[in-house]
Amino acid sequence: MPQLVPFYFLNQLTYGFLLLIILLVLFSQFLLPRILRLYISRLFISKL
């Protein structure tokens, strides 16, 4: 089980943080604005 070998801790932390940063950028730049636009448009349509 390489997860328990201390030699691999730094490698797992590095790739974990890198993946977290990439996902954060992707969500904040692409996915969340689309969801927000959809939510706002539905809100305005329901108030008509």
UniProtKB/Swiss-Prot annotation:
Highest classification ranks of the organism: Eukaryota, Fungi, Dikarya, Ascomycota, Saccharomycotina
Keyword Hydrolase: no
Alphabetically ordered keywords of this record: ATP synthesis, CF(0), Hydrogen ion transport, Ion transport, Membrane, Mitochondrion, Transmembrane, Transmembrane helix, Transport
Protein's membrane topology: Single-pass membrane protein
InterPro entries: ATP_synth_su8_fun (IPR009230)
Main location: mitochondrion
Physiological role: Mitochondrial membrane ATP synthase (F(1)F(0) ATP synthase or Complex V) produces ATP from ADP in the presence of a proton gradient across the membrane which is generated by electron transport complexes of the respiratory chain. F-type ATPases consist of two structural domains, F(1) - containing the extramembraneous catalytic core and F(0) - containing the membrane proton channel, linked together by a central stalk and a peripheral stalk. During catalysis, ATP synthesis in the catalytic domain of F(1) is coupled via a rotary mechanism of the central stalk subunits to proton translocation.
Subunit and interaction comment: F-type ATPases have 2 components, CF(1) - the catalytic core - and CF(0) - the membrane proton channel.
Annotated TM spans: 13-33
PANTHER family according to UniProt: ATP SYNTHASE PROTEIN 8
Subcellular location: Mitochondrion membrane
The UniProt record lists the keyword Mitochondrion: yes
GO MF annotation terms: proton-transporting ATP synthase activity, rotational mechanism
Protein name in the entry: ATP synthase protein 8
GO annotations of cellular component type: mitochondrial membrane; proton-transporting ATP synthase complex
Family: Belongs to the ATPase protein 8 family.
Pfam families: Fun_ATP-synt_8 (PF05933)
